[in-house]
Amino acid sequence: MSGTKVPESVLVVIHTPDLKVLLLERADHPGFWQSVTGSKDRVDEPLGETCRREVFEETGIDTARHELTDWQLQNRYEIYPHWRHRYPDGVTHNVEHVFGLRVPEALEVTMAPREHLACEWLPWERAAERCFSWSNAE
């Protein structure tokens, strides 16, 4: 049986003006750190709406109060075979759209406990080194 997950997602890099970046440690893969990511809930969901929903769900940060920017970057990557059952039959790749969310300072974060174990604000160079996903590190 095939799944219904939409193979289109967002990656939202949350950062301060001095380029401290928020990273989240994944609960399902301890030791793997990333920015906020998430798939569209439906094919016609606007990407900005996906960003707002995912950022709020994963951090408690309201994007409406800050500067959300579409960086006009996309990553196309192969979906791991063990996750393909979540998608319609025949889907093997996902397209990820990259956004930035500029916040005035390192904000307090309310993590989604089922999704993340820890969070940390790091200078962008250290954040890039720590990221699990190659698309996060770029």
PLM segments and residue spans:
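A conserved beta-turn-beta hairpin within the catalytic core of GNAT-like acetyltransferases
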Residues: 29-32
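A short gly/proline-enriched turn/hairpin at secondary-structure junctions
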Residues: 34-37
